[in-house]
A protein has these predicted regions:
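Structured catalytic-domain cores with a bias toward divalent-metal coordination
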Residues: 1-169
């Protein structure tokens, strides 16, 4: 509720009915997300120069919301990967994507899903591109899915190794 109030206040309009409806929507949305998922992926788009990696750089309006920011000079500033997870941040940045690691402690509590997931210490990533840039969208999403798939394989491989070691000790 606090995040909803703060967001509506920044927009200049606080309406009790709107607050109630947003709370209902948020509760229903959270019910739809299984607890078992390892990472929630959100897909957003923005308009040219309205919301970008610069928003999170020192001097930007959301500079306190990020603990780390990687801005690639060859990428469009509007195309970003924002995450609550250090590993995902590092990997997306290593592939040259504008990347933002949300500061889960100091982030502005705006009621967004990234803030909620950060508070829960859960993995969340938002792939966001300028409206209409579907090729970039797909490329970033494909790379993210590859990263997550590699992690899954590594966990499975480690589990198999652990099982072999346990069996050989008997």
């Amino acid at each position: 509720r606090k995040g909803i109030m703060l967001t509506l206040k920044t927009k200049g309009k606080i309406n009790p009915l709107a607050i109630h409806e947003v709370e209902k929507f948020a509760a229903e949305l959270l019910k739809q997300i299984p607890d078992s998922i390892s990472c929630l992926i959100a897909l957003h788009n923005n308009t040219n120069n309205d919301f970008s990696v610069r928003t999170y750089l020192p001097g930007g309006p959301r500079q306190n919301d990020a603990s780390q920011v990687y801005a690639d000079e060859w990428q469009d500033i509007d195309d970003i990967a924002l995450t609550t997870d250090q590993d995902i941040y590092s990997k997306m940045a290593s592939f040259g994507y504008n990347s933002i690691l949300q500061d889960n402690v100091n982030v502005f509590r705006d009621g967004s899903l990234s803030v909620y997931y950060g508070e829960q210490n859960r993995r969340y990533i938002n792939i966001e591109t300028q409206h209409g840039k579907t090729v970039q969208y797909r490329e970033m999403l494909k790379k993210l899915l590859s990263i997550l798939d590699d992690e899954k394989k590594m966990v499975a491989s480690q589990a198999a190794t652990d099982m072999e070691q346990t069996t050989s000790l008997r």
